[in-house]
Protein backbone atom coordinates (compact mmCIF):
# COMPACT_ATOMS: atom_id res chain seq x y z
CA UNK A 1 0.00 0.00 0.00
CA UNK A 2 1.23 3.50 -0.81
CA UNK A 3 0.88 6.24 1.81
CA UNK A 4 0.68 9.17 -0.61
CA UNK A 5 -2.38 11.41 -0.56
CA UNK A 6 -3.93 14.24 -2.54
CA UNK A 7 -6.83 16.55 -1.78
CA UNK A 8 -9.60 16.98 -4.35
CA UNK A 9 -12.55 19.30 -3.63
CA UNK A 10 -11.58 19.29 0.04
CA UNK A 11 -11.53 15.49 0.36
CA UNK A 12 -8.48 13.34 1.06
CA UNK A 13 -7.71 10.53 -1.41
CA UNK A 14 -4.95 7.93 -1.39
CA UNK A 15 -2.77 7.53 -4.46
CA UNK A 16 -2.14 4.14 -6.01
CA UNK A 17 0.36 2.67 -8.45
CA UNK A 18 0.03 1.55 -12.04
CA UNK A 19 0.21 -1.87 -13.66
CA UNK A 20 3.52 -0.67 -15.09
CA UNK A 21 4.92 -0.15 -11.60
CA UNK A 22 3.71 -3.64 -10.63
CA UNK A 23 5.48 -5.21 -13.62
CA UNK A 24 8.63 -3.22 -12.88
CA UNK A 25 8.62 -4.15 -9.20
CA UNK A 26 8.06 -7.84 -9.89
CA UNK A 27 10.88 -7.84 -12.46
CA UNK A 28 13.35 -6.14 -10.13
CA UNK A 29 12.47 -8.47 -7.27
CA UNK A 30 12.89 -11.53 -9.49
CA UNK A 31 16.33 -10.33 -10.59
CA UNK A 32 17.46 -9.67 -7.00
CA UNK A 33 16.27 -13.11 -5.92
CA UNK A 34 18.05 -14.75 -8.85
CA UNK A 35 21.30 -12.91 -8.10
CA UNK A 36 21.23 -13.38 -4.33
CA UNK A 37 19.66 -16.87 -4.31
CA UNK A 38 17.21 -15.91 -1.56
CA UNK A 39 13.62 -14.76 -1.32
CA UNK A 40 12.64 -11.19 -0.54
CA UNK A 41 9.30 -9.85 0.67
CA UNK A 42 9.55 -6.26 -0.55
CA UNK A 43 11.27 -4.25 -3.24
CA UNK A 44 11.76 -0.52 -3.79
CA UNK A 45 11.47 1.08 -7.22
CA UNK A 46 11.63 4.64 -8.46
CA UNK A 47 8.90 6.15 -10.62
CA UNK A 48 8.87 8.90 -13.27
CA UNK A 49 6.69 10.84 -10.81
CA UNK A 50 9.67 11.03 -8.45
CA UNK A 51 7.90 8.92 -5.81
CA UNK A 52 9.66 5.78 -4.56
CA UNK A 53 7.44 2.74 -4.06
CA UNK A 54 7.96 -0.10 -1.59
CA UNK A 55 6.08 -3.00 -3.14
CA UNK A 56 5.13 -6.27 -1.46
CA UNK A 57 6.34 -9.37 -3.31
CA UNK A 58 4.10 -12.44 -3.50
CA UNK A 59 3.74 -15.82 -5.26
CA UNK A 60 7.46 -16.56 -5.47
CA UNK A 61 8.69 -19.61 -7.36
CA UNK A 62 12.11 -20.41 -8.78
CA UNK A 63 14.31 -22.75 -10.75
CA UNK A 64 18.02 -22.91 -11.58
CA UNK A 65 18.09 -19.93 -13.95
CA UNK A 66 14.71 -18.33 -13.35
CA UNK A 67 12.54 -16.68 -10.71
CA UNK A 68 8.98 -15.47 -10.95
CA UNK A 69 6.89 -13.44 -8.52
CA UNK A 70 4.00 -11.00 -8.45
CA UNK A 71 2.94 -7.58 -7.19
CA UNK A 72 -0.70 -6.84 -6.43
CA UNK A 73 -2.13 -3.82 -8.28
CA UNK A 74 -3.29 -1.06 -5.93
CA UNK A 75 -5.31 1.74 -7.47
CA UNK A 76 -5.52 3.69 -4.22
CA UNK A 77 -8.86 5.46 -3.94
CA UNK A 78 -9.24 5.48 -7.73
CA UNK A 79 -10.54 1.93 -8.09
CA UNK A 80 -10.58 0.51 -11.61
CA UNK A 81 -11.04 -2.94 -13.13
CA UNK A 82 -7.42 -3.95 -12.50
CA UNK A 83 -7.37 -3.05 -8.80
CA UNK A 84 -6.32 -6.02 -6.67
CA UNK A 85 -5.13 -8.23 -9.51
CA UNK A 86 -1.74 -9.94 -9.48
CA UNK A 87 0.82 -8.81 -12.06
CA UNK A 88 3.58 -11.40 -12.50
CA UNK A 89 7.10 -11.22 -13.90
CA UNK A 90 9.15 -14.29 -14.80
CA UNK A 91 12.83 -13.45 -15.25
CA UNK A 92 15.10 -16.10 -16.73
CA UNK A 93 18.51 -16.42 -18.32
CA UNK A 94 18.25 -17.90 -21.81
CA UNK A 95 20.40 -18.52 -24.86
CA UNK A 96 20.08 -15.98 -27.66
CA UNK A 97 18.17 -18.41 -29.87
CA UNK A 98 15.53 -18.80 -27.14
CA UNK A 99 14.47 -15.15 -27.29
CA UNK A 100 10.99 -15.08 -28.89
CA UNK A 101 10.17 -12.90 -31.88
CA UNK A 102 7.00 -11.83 -30.08
CA UNK A 103 8.42 -9.23 -27.74
CA UNK A 104 8.34 -5.54 -26.93
CA UNK A 105 10.46 -2.91 -28.65
CA UNK A 106 13.24 -2.07 -26.22
CA UNK A 107 16.63 -0.44 -26.73
CA UNK A 108 18.76 -3.16 -25.13
CA UNK A 109 21.00 -5.90 -26.47
CA UNK A 110 20.74 -8.11 -23.39
CA UNK A 111 17.24 -7.56 -21.95
CA UNK A 112 14.11 -8.71 -23.77
CA UNK A 113 10.55 -8.32 -22.55
CA UNK A 114 7.60 -10.35 -23.76
CA UNK A 115 4.11 -11.07 -22.49
CA UNK A 116 2.31 -14.19 -21.42
CA UNK A 117 -1.12 -15.16 -20.18
CA UNK A 118 -3.57 -12.30 -19.67
CA UNK A 119 -1.52 -9.51 -21.28
CA UNK A 120 -3.05 -8.14 -24.46
CA UNK A 121 -1.63 -7.78 -27.92
CA UNK A 122 -1.96 -4.66 -30.08
CA UNK A 123 -4.06 -5.35 -33.17
CA UNK A 124 -4.56 -1.89 -34.73
CA UNK A 125 -2.47 1.04 -35.88
CA UNK A 126 -2.65 4.38 -34.10
CA UNK A 127 -1.23 3.48 -30.69
CA UNK A 128 2.29 4.06 -29.42
CA UNK A 129 2.95 0.33 -29.83
CA UNK A 130 3.23 -1.40 -33.19
CA UNK A 131 0.50 -3.90 -34.14
CA UNK A 132 1.44 -7.44 -33.20
CA UNK A 133 3.46 -6.38 -30.16
CA UNK A 134 2.64 -6.97 -26.47
CA UNK A 135 0.46 -4.25 -24.94
CA UNK A 136 3.23 -3.00 -22.68
CA UNK A 137 3.69 0.75 -22.96
CA UNK A 138 7.02 2.51 -23.39
CA UNK A 139 7.21 4.05 -19.92
CA UNK A 140 6.91 0.70 -18.07
CA UNK A 141 9.50 -0.75 -20.47
CA UNK A 142 11.92 2.08 -19.64
CA UNK A 143 11.22 1.66 -15.92
CA UNK A 144 12.06 -2.05 -16.13
CA UNK A 145 15.27 -1.43 -18.09
CA UNK A 146 16.38 1.25 -15.61
CA UNK A 147 15.78 -0.93 -12.55
CA UNK A 148 17.49 -3.95 -14.12
CA UNK A 149 20.57 -1.90 -15.02
CA UNK A 150 20.76 -0.28 -11.58
CA UNK A 151 20.33 -3.62 -9.80
CA UNK A 152 23.17 -5.18 -11.78
CA UNK A 153 25.38 -2.13 -11.14
CA UNK A 154 24.66 -2.26 -7.39
CA UNK A 155 25.61 -5.94 -7.38
CA UNK A 156 29.00 -4.95 -8.81
CA UNK A 157 28.55 -7.15 -11.84
CA UNK A 158 29.73 -6.59 -15.36
CA UNK A 159 26.57 -7.55 -17.13
CA UNK A 160 28.22 -9.18 -20.12
CA UNK A 161 30.61 -11.22 -17.98
CA UNK A 162 27.71 -12.29 -15.78
CA UNK A 163 25.51 -13.32 -18.68
CA UNK A 164 28.27 -15.10 -20.59
CA UNK A 165 26.50 -14.70 -23.90
CA UNK A 166 23.06 -15.39 -22.47
CA UNK A 167 20.15 -12.95 -22.44
CA UNK A 168 17.70 -11.83 -19.78
CA UNK A 169 14.16 -12.68 -20.83
CA UNK A 170 11.31 -11.14 -18.83
CA UNK A 171 7.77 -12.41 -19.33
CA UNK A 172 5.00 -10.26 -17.88
CA UNK A 173 1.72 -12.09 -17.29
CA UNK A 174 -1.53 -11.81 -15.36
CA UNK A 175 -3.65 -14.95 -14.92
CA UNK A 176 -6.84 -12.90 -14.46
CA UNK A 177 -6.02 -10.54 -17.31
CA UNK A 178 -8.19 -11.92 -20.09
CA UNK A 179 -11.33 -11.82 -17.96
CA UNK A 180 -10.59 -8.43 -16.40
CA UNK A 181 -9.85 -6.92 -19.84
CA UNK A 182 -13.55 -7.31 -20.66
CA UNK A 183 -14.24 -4.52 -18.16
CA UNK A 184 -11.72 -2.11 -19.69
CA UNK A 185 -11.46 0.09 -22.81
CA UNK A 186 -9.02 -2.34 -24.44
CA UNK A 187 -11.36 -3.74 -27.09
CA UNK A 188 -12.08 -0.18 -28.27
CA UNK A 189 -8.35 0.51 -28.46
CA UNK A 190 -7.47 -2.45 -30.63
CA UNK A 191 -5.94 -4.50 -27.83
CA UNK A 192 -7.03 -8.11 -27.67
CA UNK A 193 -6.48 -11.01 -25.32
CA UNK A 194 -5.85 -9.26 -22.04
CA UNK A 195 -4.99 -6.12 -20.10
CA UNK A 196 -2.42 -3.46 -20.92
CA UNK A 197 0.66 -2.69 -18.85
CA UNK A 198 0.42 1.08 -18.70
CA UNK A 199 1.29 4.23 -16.80
CA UNK A 200 3.17 7.41 -17.66
CA UNK A 201 4.18 8.37 -14.10
CA UNK A 202 4.00 5.04 -12.26
CA UNK A 203 1.46 6.57 -9.89
CA UNK A 204 -2.35 6.49 -10.04
CA UNK A 205 -3.77 9.91 -9.21
CA UNK A 206 -7.20 9.52 -7.56
CA UNK A 207 -10.11 11.45 -9.03
CA UNK A 208 -8.01 12.30 -12.08
CA UNK A 209 -9.49 12.36 -15.57
CA UNK A 210 -6.14 12.13 -17.35
CA UNK A 211 -6.06 8.36 -17.85
CA UNK A 212 -9.62 8.35 -19.13
CA UNK A 213 -8.92 11.17 -21.56
CA UNK A 214 -5.81 9.43 -22.89
CA UNK A 215 -7.83 6.27 -23.55
CA UNK A 216 -10.45 8.25 -25.48
CA UNK A 217 -7.73 10.05 -27.42
CA UNK A 218 -6.09 6.73 -28.29
CA UNK A 219 -9.40 5.49 -29.67
CA UNK A 220 -9.61 8.59 -31.87
CA UNK A 221 -6.05 8.01 -33.09
CA UNK A 222 -6.94 4.47 -34.11
CA UNK A 223 -9.95 5.68 -36.11
CA UNK A 224 -7.75 8.22 -37.90
CA UNK A 225 -5.07 5.60 -38.60
CA UNK A 226 -7.78 3.52 -40.28
CA UNK A 227 -8.16 6.33 -42.80
CA UNK A 228 -11.35 7.87 -41.45
CA UNK A 229 -11.73 11.58 -42.15
CA UNK A 230 -15.08 11.95 -40.37
CA UNK A 231 -15.88 11.00 -36.80
CA UNK A 232 -18.99 11.09 -34.61
CA UNK A 233 -18.55 12.18 -31.00
CA UNK A 234 -21.24 11.28 -28.46
CA UNK A 235 -21.40 11.83 -24.69
CA UNK A 236 -22.29 8.22 -23.94
CA UNK A 237 -24.41 5.20 -24.74
CA UNK A 238 -27.62 7.14 -25.37
CA UNK A 239 -26.03 9.25 -28.10
CA UNK A 240 -24.25 6.24 -29.58
CA UNK A 241 -27.41 4.14 -29.77
CA UNK A 242 -29.49 6.95 -31.27
CA UNK A 243 -26.91 7.81 -33.92
CA UNK A 244 -26.57 4.13 -34.86
CA UNK A 245 -30.23 3.08 -34.80
CA UNK A 246 -32.00 6.21 -36.02
CA UNK A 247 -29.42 7.55 -38.47
CA UNK A 248 -27.60 4.44 -39.59
CA UNK A 249 -24.24 5.65 -38.32
CA UNK A 250 -21.43 3.09 -38.41
CA UNK A 251 -20.70 2.05 -34.83
CA UNK A 252 -17.00 1.87 -35.69
CA UNK A 253 -17.15 5.56 -36.61
CA UNK A 254 -18.54 6.62 -33.22
CA UNK A 255 -16.36 7.55 -30.24
CA UNK A 256 -17.70 8.33 -26.78
CA UNK A 257 -16.29 11.60 -25.46
CA UNK A 258 -17.86 11.44 -21.97
CA UNK A 259 -17.83 14.94 -20.45
CA UNK A 260 -14.65 16.01 -22.26
CA UNK A 261 -16.19 17.92 -25.16
CA UNK A 262 -13.46 20.52 -25.55
CA UNK A 263 -10.59 18.08 -25.09
CA UNK A 264 -11.97 15.68 -27.68
CA UNK A 265 -12.67 18.47 -30.16
CA UNK A 266 -9.06 19.62 -29.92
CA UNK A 267 -7.89 16.04 -30.39
CA UNK A 268 -9.91 15.72 -33.61
CA UNK A 269 -8.20 18.86 -34.87
CA UNK A 270 -4.75 17.61 -33.87
CA UNK A 271 -5.33 14.28 -35.60
CA UNK A 272 -6.51 15.91 -38.81
CA UNK A 273 -10.15 14.87 -39.08
CA UNK A 274 -12.07 16.77 -41.77
CA UNK A 275 -15.57 16.45 -40.30
CA UNK A 276 -16.89 16.08 -36.75
CA UNK A 277 -20.49 15.27 -35.91
CA UNK A 278 -21.49 15.81 -32.29
CA UNK A 279 -24.67 13.97 -31.40
CA UNK A 280 -26.37 13.45 -28.08
CA UNK A 281 -29.02 14.28 -25.55
CA UNK A 282 -29.84 17.96 -25.28
CA UNK A 283 -29.19 17.84 -21.54
CA UNK A 284 -25.48 17.39 -22.23
CA UNK A 285 -25.00 19.33 -25.43
CA UNK A 286 -26.96 22.44 -24.41
CA UNK A 287 -23.92 23.25 -22.30
CA UNK A 288 -21.79 23.52 -25.43
CA UNK A 289 -24.36 26.03 -26.76
CA UNK A 290 -23.33 28.22 -23.84
CA UNK A 291 -19.61 27.72 -24.41
CA UNK A 292 -19.15 25.09 -21.68
CA UNK A 293 -16.69 22.45 -22.90
CA UNK A 294 -16.72 20.10 -19.91
CA UNK A 295 -20.26 18.86 -19.36
CA UNK A 296 -19.80 17.36 -15.89
CA UNK A 297 -22.28 18.88 -13.45
CA UNK A 298 -19.55 19.61 -10.89
CA UNK A 299 -17.75 21.76 -13.49
CA UNK A 300 -20.77 23.69 -14.74
CA UNK A 301 -24.50 23.30 -15.21
CA UNK A 302 -26.34 26.37 -16.58
CA UNK A 303 -28.85 24.29 -18.59
CA UNK A 304 -31.82 26.33 -17.38
CA UNK A 305 -29.98 29.61 -17.82
CA UNK A 306 -28.93 28.81 -21.39
CA UNK A 307 -32.42 27.63 -22.35
CA UNK A 308 -34.15 30.61 -20.75
CA UNK A 309 -31.75 33.13 -22.30
CA UNK A 310 -32.28 31.77 -25.81
CA UNK A 311 -36.06 31.59 -25.39
CA UNK A 312 -36.02 35.20 -24.23
CA UNK A 313 -34.09 36.21 -27.36
CA UNK A 314 -36.90 34.63 -29.38
CA UNK A 315 -39.45 36.77 -27.55
CA UNK A 316 -40.93 34.04 -25.34
CA UNK A 317 -43.31 35.38 -22.65
CA UNK A 318 -42.12 35.78 -19.08
CA UNK A 319 -44.48 33.11 -17.76
CA UNK A 320 -42.97 30.52 -20.12
CA UNK A 321 -39.47 31.54 -19.07
CA UNK A 322 -40.39 31.09 -15.40
CA UNK A 323 -41.98 27.71 -16.08
CA UNK A 324 -38.91 26.49 -17.96
CA UNK A 325 -36.57 27.82 -15.27
CA UNK A 326 -38.47 25.84 -12.62
CA UNK A 327 -37.96 22.52 -14.44
CA UNK A 328 -35.73 19.93 -12.81
CA UNK A 329 -34.70 18.24 -16.07
CA UNK A 330 -34.02 19.22 -19.66
CA UNK A 331 -36.64 16.75 -20.89
CA UNK A 332 -39.26 18.53 -18.81
CA UNK A 333 -38.15 21.80 -20.45
CA UNK A 334 -38.48 20.21 -23.90
CA UNK A 335 -42.07 19.12 -23.24
CA UNK A 336 -43.12 22.57 -22.06
CA UNK A 337 -41.36 24.36 -24.92
CA UNK A 338 -42.94 22.09 -27.54
CA UNK A 339 -46.42 22.67 -26.14
CA UNK A 340 -45.82 26.43 -26.10
CA UNK A 341 -44.81 26.45 -29.77
CA UNK A 342 -41.20 27.55 -29.31
CA UNK A 343 -39.44 24.49 -30.72
CA UNK A 344 -37.34 26.79 -32.93
CA UNK A 345 -35.14 27.35 -29.88
CA UNK A 346 -33.66 23.88 -30.40
CA UNK A 347 -32.36 24.88 -33.83
CA UNK A 348 -30.85 28.01 -32.29
CA UNK A 349 -29.12 25.89 -29.65
CA UNK A 350 -27.77 23.41 -32.22
CA UNK A 351 -26.35 26.24 -34.34
CA UNK A 352 -24.80 27.90 -31.30
CA UNK A 353 -23.24 24.62 -30.17
CA UNK A 354 -21.60 24.18 -33.58
CA UNK A 355 -20.45 27.80 -33.57
CA UNK A 356 -19.01 27.56 -30.04
CA UNK A 357 -17.17 24.37 -31.02
CA UNK A 358 -15.53 26.16 -33.95
CA UNK A 359 -14.56 29.11 -31.76
CA UNK A 360 -13.10 26.81 -29.10
CA UNK A 361 -11.07 24.95 -31.72
CA UNK A 362 -9.92 28.25 -33.26
CA UNK A 363 -10.89 27.02 -36.69
CA UNK A 364 -9.91 29.28 -39.56
CA UNK A 365 -10.70 29.07 -43.26
CA UNK A 366 -7.48 27.15 -43.80
CA UNK A 367 -8.58 24.32 -41.48
CA UNK A 368 -11.23 22.87 -43.83
CA UNK A 369 -13.10 21.20 -40.99
CA UNK A 370 -16.87 20.82 -40.78
CA UNK A 371 -18.75 20.67 -37.48
CA UNK A 372 -22.33 19.42 -37.17
CA UNK A 373 -24.43 19.10 -34.02
CA UNK A 374 -27.47 16.86 -33.52
CA UNK A 375 -29.67 17.43 -30.45
CA UNK A 376 -31.97 14.62 -29.27
CA UNK A 377 -34.59 14.16 -26.59
CA UNK A 378 -34.47 11.15 -24.29
CA UNK A 379 -36.89 9.20 -26.50
CA UNK A 380 -34.46 9.48 -29.41
CA UNK A 381 -36.37 12.02 -31.46
CA UNK A 382 -34.33 14.66 -33.26
CA UNK A 383 -34.90 18.12 -31.82
CA UNK A 384 -32.59 19.96 -34.20
CA UNK A 385 -29.55 19.72 -36.46
CA UNK A 386 -27.14 22.60 -36.89
CA UNK A 387 -26.94 24.37 -40.24
CA UNK A 388 -24.09 26.84 -40.13
Language-model segments: what does each one mean?
Residues 100, 124, 181, 242-244, ...:
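Generic domain-boundary/flexible-linker signal
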Amino acid sequence: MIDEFVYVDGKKYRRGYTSGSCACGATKAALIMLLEKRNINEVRIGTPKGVDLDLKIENISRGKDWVQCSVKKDGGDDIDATHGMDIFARLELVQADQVPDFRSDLDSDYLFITSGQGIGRVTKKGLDIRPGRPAINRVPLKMILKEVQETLDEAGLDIYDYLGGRKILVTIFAPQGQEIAKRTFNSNLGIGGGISIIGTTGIVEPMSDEGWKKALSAELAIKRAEGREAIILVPGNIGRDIMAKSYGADLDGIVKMSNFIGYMLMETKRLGFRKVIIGGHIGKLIKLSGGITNSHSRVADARSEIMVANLALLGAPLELLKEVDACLSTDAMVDIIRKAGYSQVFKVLADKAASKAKVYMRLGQEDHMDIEVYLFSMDGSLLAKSQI
